[in-house]
Amino acid sequence: MSEIILGIESSCDDTSAAVIKDGYLLSNVLASQDVHKAYGGVIPELASRAHQVNIVPVVSEAITRAGIKASDITAIAFTRGPGLLGSLLVGTSFAKGLAMAIDKPLVEVNHLQGHILANFIKQYDSENRQPEFPYLCLLVSGGNSQIVRVNSPLEYEILGQTIDDAVGEAFDKCSKMMGLGYPGGPIVDRLAKQGDPNKFKFSKPHIPGFDYSFSGIKTSLLYFVRDQMALDPEFMEKNKEDICASFQKALIDILMDKLIKAAKHTGIKQITIGGGVSANSGLRARIEEEGRKRGWTTFLPEFKFTTDNAAMIAIAGWFHYQNGERASLDVAPVSRLAEF
């Protein structure tokens, strides 16, 4: 019998619902919130209110596009955390209410696990390349920077992670410092394509093992811009493309140095990336370049699966469902999950 999973994602500022049937994507609907751009970052209260407005039409649209009825659903997978508590509460509450209404089981999903398993989303019109276990996943976003050894769909080992800030936060800070707008990652990436990545140098951390640190390089950028602007008030406007290109290269170098080290240490040559920063064109190109040099088999998620989306929650939920896992109706969202 076919297994149809409805996935619901509401961890931050994107309301999303998706339907997967036996691992194949039938629909993936996303409602983004533009209201946060004016504030230069996500405002939790505004995000929660927008989720309340969007959740019903988004889920209804996902079911309609999938060509199914609510009664056809086998289980409902939802993001329990980590994320903004108010946002998570909307998705969790809706999932529980729908589960009671149609008498279907609930499956809770770790948001980060969804990113890690994004390459397992199958599509009818796609090649559907999938990594073999074990593989390494470079998980990079606004809130996380980790190197994860993935032994199976449900078994993970965090080899390294940031000890302070996430790489996505560094991109946002760069954009904010230069007055470029929000979200910073795509803006910096776009300008970096027009600049010289070797024009300026930024100090890199010396952290043992496979852990990351991005607080120092943010400070390095701050002092660099401040000192140069003191000499020439037009410096940033004249050099914004080169600054973005150089800063982006420095961040990618930091990410890749530890990933290469982890791959050598483990002997694993199946390499994936996940999370919002995995959409960065410079990082994607560098992963593939290193893969060719080092004999890696690399897997890059489609751009639509790099940002927060319910398709990845549905596929992760499918694996949990097949493992016999169910969530109780009194389950509560958690803003921080210490481990998978």
What is each stretch, according to the model?
Residues 1-2, 109-135, 316:
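Conserved phosphate-binding catalytic cores of ATP/NTP-utilizing and phosphoryl-transfer enzymes
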Residues 2-82, 111, 115, 243:
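N-terminal beta-alpha supersecondary unit
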Residues 15-20, 137-139, 145-149:
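Short beta-strand scaffold segments in enzyme catalytic cores
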Residues 69, 190-271, 280-294, 321-324, ...:
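A contiguous, well-structured pocket-lining segment that forms one wall/lid of small-molecule binding clefts
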Residues 69-80, 266-278, 299-302:
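Short glycine-rich phosphate-binding loop at a beta-alpha junction
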Residues 108-109, 288-313:
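Conserved phosphate-binding/catalytic loops in two-lobed NTP-binding clefts
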Residues 113, 151-194, 218-219, 223-227:
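Glycine-rich phosphate-binding loop plus the immediately following alpha-helix
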Residues 115-117, 301-339:
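Glycine-rich phosphate-binding/hydrolytic loop that grips phosphoryl groups
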